[in-house]
C-alpha cells in the first residue's frame, strides 16, 4: 500500500559556495559602494568563515571576556561545549574595527545590546539573524552569485574545504 511513498529525507540543498563565489562574497570589490548595514553583514560572514565556520548565534553571543590576545575561548550556544579558536590576523582586524564600544555591554561585537532580558534578547537575536540573511541575499546579487546565500554558507564552506 505505501510502497511508493517516500519517507526519507531529501538532502540535496547545496549550502556551500565554490571558492570563487565565496571569494566574491567576502572580498570582491564592487561596482558601487555597499550600504553600511551590508558592510557589517559582510564583516560578520567574513568573521564566521575565518573563525572556523562559527555559527552566527555564537558570533553574536561572544563576550568581551572570551577574547584573550589572539584566541577566543567560548561555549558553543547549541551544545555548551567549550571551543578555543586561534584568531587569524584578518579576523583580528575585523574584530578591532567592529568591536563593541559600549562599556555596559558584555558582548564583543555590537550585534546584541546586552541590556535586555532573555526573551527580549532572543527577539533581538532573531531580528539580527533575519537582517544578516537579508543582507547576504542582497550582497550575493551585488556580487553576481546565483546561489542562495545565508548565514550557513560560512559553516558549510568551511566544512567543504
Model-inferred region functions:
Residues 2-7, 77, 110-117:
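Short linear capping/connector segments at secondary-structure termini
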Residues 18-23, 88-146:
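Active-site/catalytic core of tyrosine-dependent DNA strand-transfer enzymes
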Residues 20-22, 40-46, 69, 80-82, ...:
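Active-site lining segments that contact anionic ligands and/or coordinate catalytic metals
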Residues 3-4, 61-97:
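Conserved tyrosine-mediated DNA breakage-rejoining catalytic core shared by Y-recombinases
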Residues 45-48, 52, 59, 151-161:
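Short, basic/aromatic-rich helical patch in the C-terminal catalytic core of site-specific tyrosine
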Residues 2-56:
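Basic, Lys/Arg- and aromatic-enriched nucleic-acid-binding interface segment
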Residues 31-36, 133-161:
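Short, basic (Lys/Arg/His-rich) helix/loop patches that form interaction surfaces
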Residues 31-35, 73-86, 119-128, 146-153:
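Short, contiguous acidic/charged loop-to-helix segments that flank catalytic cores in large enzymes
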Amino acid at each position: 500500500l505505501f510502497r511508493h511513498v517516500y519517507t526519507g529525507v531529501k538532502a540535496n540543498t547545496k549550502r556551500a559556495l565554490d571558492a570563487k563565489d565565496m571569494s566574491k562574497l567576502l572580498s570582491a570589490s564592487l561596482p558601487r559602494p555597499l550600504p553600511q548595514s551590508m558592510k557589517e553583514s559582510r564583516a560578520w560572514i567574513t568573521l564566521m568563515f575565518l573563525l572556523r565556520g562559527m555559527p552566527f548565534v555564537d558570533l553574536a553571543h561572544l563576550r568581551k571576556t572570551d577574547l584573550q590576545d589572539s584566541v577566543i575561548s567560548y561555549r558553543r550556544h547549541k551544545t555548551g561545549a567549550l571551543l578555543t579558536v586561534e584568531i587569524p590576523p584578518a579576523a583580528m582586524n575585523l574584530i578591532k574595527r567592529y568591536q563593541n564600544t559600549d562599556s555596559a555591554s558584555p558582548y564583543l561585537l555590537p550585534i546584541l545590546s546586552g541590556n535586555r532580558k532573555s526573551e527580549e534578547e532572543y527577539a533581538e537575536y532573531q531580528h539580527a539573524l533575519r537582517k544578516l540573511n537579508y543582507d547576504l541575499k542582497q550582497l550575493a546579487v551585488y556580487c553576481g552569485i546565483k546561489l542562495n546565500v545565508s548565514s550557513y554558507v560560512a559553516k558549510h564552506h568551511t566544512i567543504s574545504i
